Amino acid sequence: MKNIREIVKEKILILDGAMGTEIQKYNLTEEDFRGDRFRDVPGMMKGNNDMLNITRPDVISDIYRRYLEAGADIITANTFSCQRISQADYHLEDCAREMAFEGARLARIECDKFSTPDKPRFVAGDVGPTNKTCSMSPDVSDPAAREITYDELFTDVCEQVDGLIEGGADVILIETIFDTLNCKAMIDAAITMMKKHGVELPIMISLTVSDLAGRTLSGQTVDAFLASLSPYPIFSVGMNCAFGAPQMKPFIEHLAKVAPYYISAHPNAGLPNEMGQYDETAESMAPQIAEFIDEGIVNIIGGCCGTSPEFIAHYARSAEGKKPHQVVEKPKYMWLSGLDLLQVDDSVHLPVDASRFVNVGERCNVAGSRKFLRLINEKGYEEAIGIARKQVADGAAVVDVNMDDGLLDAKAEMMNFLNMIAAEPEIAKVPVMIDSSKWDVILAGLKCCQGKCVVNSISLKEGEEVFLSHARDVMRYGAAVVVMCFDEVGQATTYERRIEIAERAYHLLVDKLGMNPLDIIFDPNVLAIATGMEEHDNYAVEFIRATEWIHQNLPGAHVSGGVSNLSFSFRGNTYIREAIHCVFLHHAQKVGMDFGIVNAKARMDYDKIPKEQLELIEDVVLNRRKGAADDLIELAAEIKAKADAAKAAAKAGGAPAPKPAAPEWRKQAVEERLKYALQKGITEFLQPDIDEALQKYPHAVSVIEGPLMDGMNLVGELFGKGEMFLPQVVKTARTMKAAVSILQPHIEAEKQGGSTSAGKILMATVKGDVHDIGKNIVCVVMSCNNYDIIDLGVMVPAEQIVKKAIEEKVDAIGLSGLITPSLEEMVHTAQEMQKAGLRIPIMVGGATTSELHVALKIAPVYDGPVIWVKDASLNAGICARFLNETECPKFVAELDERYERLRNEYHEQQAKIASLEEARKNKLDLF
């Protein structure tokens, strides 16, 4: 039989549909899920679909069978949550591998029954994203904290994939990806286990875009996500969940144009309605899916939430005889990424006459910046982050980070700093260059970056074996790499040695390891000139010559260098140093230097250097005449003397140094300044602005309820429109917390030592639901807004929620849930609260929740206020209204009126539908 790699070129492959909603149709009980084996395991098991591979294999096999009968070519094993991380919620960690094995084994048995030479069937071992994230902090007060690490996730997924391969998987499907660092760890695990078993299975990747900004939950654009994947051997890339077909189609069209992989799509059966149900039928979805097929934008098509064998049968008929998508060529330019894509081609340039150039910011380097070293030593991370932020604002397209200092724990500091800047969207948008002479530091840094970063550096200094080992690590963790022109003999200082080492390294990397040459950046060693030693005078010229040779003879490779090394002899004379750098880059860029580690702010304009100075500096840089270095030293002394005299005169005259012009937003009213600061996450001016606001508002709490909450509401609106994305919202929340902390002493004074908490909120994901990422985000945002949060976690029974609410005397309760059964559990929780005499506000949120469901099902069974909250950024503002004695009655009245209107509209609509059904029943039967 043909394998999947052959068949995908010939036809559109049909992937199966939803598993969870199909399982629900069997109306399984808690006893069904437990079976005899897990009868005594504590907690609730219902909803843990993966355990049915062990306790009800008949149900799982039946679902597989029905999808195969419908025409599916690929059966997705029921193994989405077969990782220890996920099964820990059910106390079944030790059964995770067995579940994975059994899920794949059952699928293998059914696929083998249906396979024929003309239509072989394939098993996709399903790896879900887990409910943890490697890229985001669960703790608002500690942006560097992580709930799970790369290594922990890698270990758990290795165990899962090991079971999947042993069970008979033909493909590994990593799906519903919301965090690219999670995905990278999972790809790493899949490849590692394939090597163990001696197989090379195709890896399918399917991401989920979570907001209208078109980004993943962790903040990456689709293009940045593709860049992060580009070093890996990926079979297909696509999307699933979150969207129905019409909403997903523009993203799939884009992937089909730019992604050099087979393209997959398995959308939901439309978007959930207000009752958490999917309205699309197999018949209504068929023409939508036919558009994907007929327009040639997919190779693999299937279904996600709400789809069934009936849907898949329609898709299979639509795809029959249709041509699959033709995969586009791999890009001929380098892809790097942070939250955004950096494409190194003719579109990346500075205002000089070079075709392309990437500024690599040099100031986050403890070896090159005394200020940065001092800040890291003193744990002054906020100011250190400010240095990175300024570099990006000044034009750095990549940020170099180096923590190599004898008195620092370089590994810990590297991880801490990378995790911290990951929480700063204006920095995290650009790729990182992880710079260290210690390989364990580089490895630790690579495991912190969801984007495609650059390793600085590797070399042949310790021989080929170590060089190749390091290069394999670079490829394993999905990075590009700087290769120093350094070998076993030493550092290359001549043109001949530079090109000899570069050529040798290039062929080892490209021919022996299969590294993409576009991911190689050579550093032919920028060395100091004008040192007084004649043998150093030609260093810049030979670097430029080597750059040109590399550009012409090593296809795809790039060239970089630490530019400031060139002018080391002139340290203390900033003007001359920057002029030397400008002239050097002007000539080096012309012949192919496309990266440079520089101070982006200090870049000079070549055309604005005075003619006499320019000629002299070019004489030195290009080594055009003897004695030029001495002349430049004299010029440098003259310029420094004039600068020193000007400083002394200014000091003697008492003239203050000119202040930089204030940004435009600082000229607005204090309310607008505070709103802007929240939106952009700027903490620098909070103290003076809040001091000014306190002069204007009667009470400190009025500042919170006024301009600060106005700012938070604006952020909520922008997020809802897709004009802000989640990491920006989280940063806004941290800024809000900083503002509240400034106000706290004033609030305490006004309350004469009373509590400054805005209120105590209990949060829980309801019984039967293990999804908590959304809830965790709400907790972060709420705590930043000065609320005390009691987080009960996931799968929390109604009885526990009620008991804790009474014990802690909470002011409001937040209920979260992602899956449809959670809607019923929320109703039950409200009923239990009613029985217990609670009347505190309930906030409801989650993917399947809706205002209509609250109006129809929850509000009628509870006498306290209940509100549906659309997204995390709105909770604080809603709570503020509920807990304000003046606002609350008006707010509750508004809700009651709105719910009554929604109920009336719904019942009128249902009556019309019922009348139509009755009319059809009563039609005249003439045949």
What are these regions (language model features)?
Residues M1-F927:
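Domain-level signal for soluble alpha/beta catalytic cores
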